[in-house]
């Protein structure tokens, strides 16, 4: 059975659907939606849009035999009958259910109203200092663009590297190749591991900054896309309200209220995008293209583009969080080291500031990354023996002697003075009752645990939720088990020694 495929001539401008013929019967395939592509080409290239308008203006001027004017020359959309801009009604009786597409004059008014609110906002003072990438007009946005790192930034990175490792001697001495850097910043002998060089450390920091810039650009692009959708909705709402002579007074008021609300939402979306770092010229160009939607294909295209941008930004953000969660947290026993901190922290994350919250990943998170998270520490509410409550930066790790250590740090006088206290942890208490009066502050979500120290004292802490409670109780329990195993192996090796 022969099958003939007839395709339209690409040179011919007329649209002809593809037809498959088989056995004398033909099947007509649906036409490809070219409207969205036409709108995208119009929105990507402002110059093409201006050329198209100029050609239409010249044709209309020659048809009416009137001299062209740079001020009063009507744009083709304005010369159309306003009634023709409405969607063709399926039911002529339901006039109130029709939506209209704005003419150029209405689109310009909507554009000015949307952009005028962000002009006077004190928050939109330009792009963020850490945002980069060509987010200006021209559509040359790429997620991989990043600014070159200045020499001053590299110098600061080197200083941070030296401060992290507390010394520069291992970098130039021959004995530094057999030493590793532990999570608390001290140098501890590591079997088969060497220090990370300055070049490697700087390269990791550059890659990290590039990923952060890429994520930031994706979020800005998503915000601009959402602002474009909101602007298109505002333009359609304004056109619908303007073309309501045949409606009753009640429906006209509803249309006006909807137009005002849509313009407000669009203005706030534009302002939010500019606060996130979007370039104002690029934002104006995008909104100007969005308010000139002429068909349902244009709105569908804007919506699909915004949804895709949001999904891409969410993917990059999830990737960044996954990289944070997958920091090297391999146990020293698994690496064959004789003594090292169990909660070893990767050097590329050792200079990160304290966030106050523990990141949470999948179900295997507790068994893989708890040691590092506990070594880095987080902010917990601690109750003293007198019943007072204080916020402490709490961390638990295994020291060189193989003991589980609880470290509590607090800042005083605006961070001028810092106090640190350390205790040896012997046991985890999970049967701590709820503190009196804490039920008034989301008490149903709070959980409590205690750590028994070498002085037989139980220090109580409050967790914000069940997940944080499991991280601390199970993580410290695992640290205690590892410390006991190391102690047992040490005693066995001493007993077996001649």
UniProtKB/Swiss-Prot annotation:
Residues 201-214 have a biased composition (Basic and acidic residues). InterPro entries: PH_pln, VAB, VAN3-bd-like_auxin_canal. Residues 59-73, 122-134 have a biased composition (Polar residues). Residues 174-183 have a biased composition (Gly residues). GO terms for biological process: auxin-activated signaling pathway; leaf vascular tissue pattern formation; phloem or xylem histogenesis; post-Golgi vesicle-mediated transport; response to auxin. It holds the Pfam family Auxin_canalis. Residues 1-38, 55-95, 122-153, 172-219 are annotated as: Disordered. Interacts with VAN3. PANTHER family: EXPRESSED PROTEIN, VAN3-BINDING PROTEIN. This is VAN3-binding protein. It comes from Arabidopsis thaliana (Mouse-ear cress).
